[in-house]
């Protein structure tokens, strides 16, 4: 089922009076509030595709004829929503919304969809597939990071079914974490692109999981990577962004990750050197939203995701600064303009965006990554 919806423009003035430590959440009924109605619309986007097998873009290396199988046989839990990582974060979307709206009209259908996917048998199939020695780089780091986010969301939900799903997912969670831990010490350079392989965004997701899971080893590896890759960075060329099919900002994603790792004073100093062009006079003109020319093109439609992720990254960066920092108004004003541009594009009209943009909308409107 494909359902479209329209979310009206939000005035930047809503944000300019906010503090950095907690950008003012939208109130009930405001245009971009994550209320029950909006949650229902976002949930329907995931429900429409979680078990829709085709069209499907698999990232599948075949070793022989026996590997020629349909997606549902290769990865029996996460075979819908066009690709593996979108299927994974579509499940995350439902879990996050169910935690906030457990009695909503969509709740029964969402629980049924999760129960259909997150069975021990299905997860065993996922472990078998991902554990193959020739698939060391499968969905690394983006898809694996989202898998850990799904696990973190389930871990934080005090619900009997959620506990069952979390237990079923544990072997795959452990495998994903192990693969990332094996990779991180060998990664000699950061990956600074605007698509899936980018390290900064995935590092943020993994960092947040490690805090929930209490995985000090993962936190230590990421802290070491921070020192090697990002601590000395200066003058990030934000003016060169975006590339034509970005859905993540290399500069903003790095800053949004670093505010997780550094203390507020250290982050403020680092940010001044890294993005010296953030105005101290307010306004949103310094970073206009990206322009989408064709939402039926799966790559060009990435810019809708860029606008969504920029919005939450800008809010996250502001959240990492002290309330009196003069850069906060400009950060939140730019976030507001990106919200206003991006949220109306989150519809099911075109599957090219409908299969994944709902997750980005929920990540933004639920203030994920800032708990």
Identify the meaning behind each predicted range.
Residues 88, 97-210:
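Extended ligand-binding groove/face enriched in aromatic
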Residues 8-17:
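Bacterial N-terminal signal peptides
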Residues 1-6:
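N-terminal export leaders
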Residues 27-79:
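Low-complexity, Ser/Thr/Pro/Gly-enriched N-terminal "stalk/linker" regions
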